[in-house]
Amino acid sequence: MNDEYSQKAKREGYLARSVYKLIEINEKFSLFSYGNVLDIGASPGSFSQYAYKKLKRGILVAVDINDIGLRHVDNFYFVKGDIFSDDTVFKINTLGPYSLVISDAAPRTTGNRLVDTSNSFNLSMRIIDLSLEVLIKKGNLLVKVFQGGDEIQIFKKFEKYFKFVKKIRPKAVRKNSFEIYFLGKSFGK
């Protein structure tokens, strides 16, 4: 799709239009602080591109089952793997802990909204559970979720572990998309 955000991403050297969702959320809620950043579901790499620019005395770890279009530079590590795999989780833990976990991950879509939202829910819950293991106290978490009914459970889980919780639909989300983001700030209440 060649819309305003896709064209802007190309002009500004980002790998995907999705970066503008992260930029908008960060400008409103100041996600980045000192420390390590974990990007789950990093492919094609635009969230990682932006996160790398925002790093403050830490490392960026990008994780995905697919390769990403970024060169390996200082303080950047790419873990190719599935977050449901013990080996991948071990690598993530070895490089942590993290002050911020961001995720624009989405399951492979089928076109069946019920199936897609269910798969998104399961993936989101896994990302949250993993984040709870690797976040430092007062760390932040941003996760993409497909709306479909079960997202209230995700919101409640965020409320249980974070001082500040917000459901966000950035302007860069396509009109026909049912994706939203959940933000949790200040882990460990």
Curated annotation (Swiss-Prot):
The active site is at 144 (proton acceptor). Its EC number is 2.1.1.166. Its main location: cytoplasm. S-adenosyl-L-methionine binds at residues 45, 47, 64, 82, 104. SUPFAM superfamilies: S-adenosyl-L-methionine-dependent methyltransferases. It is found in: Cytoplasm. Specifically methylates the uridine in position 2552 of 23S rRNA at the 2'-O position of the ribose in the fully assembled 50S ribosomal subunit. The keyword Transferase applies. The gene is rlmE. Belongs to the class I-like SAM-binding methyltransferase superfamily. RNA methyltransferase RlmE family. This is Ribosomal RNA large subunit methyltransferase E. It is an enzyme of class 2 (transferase).
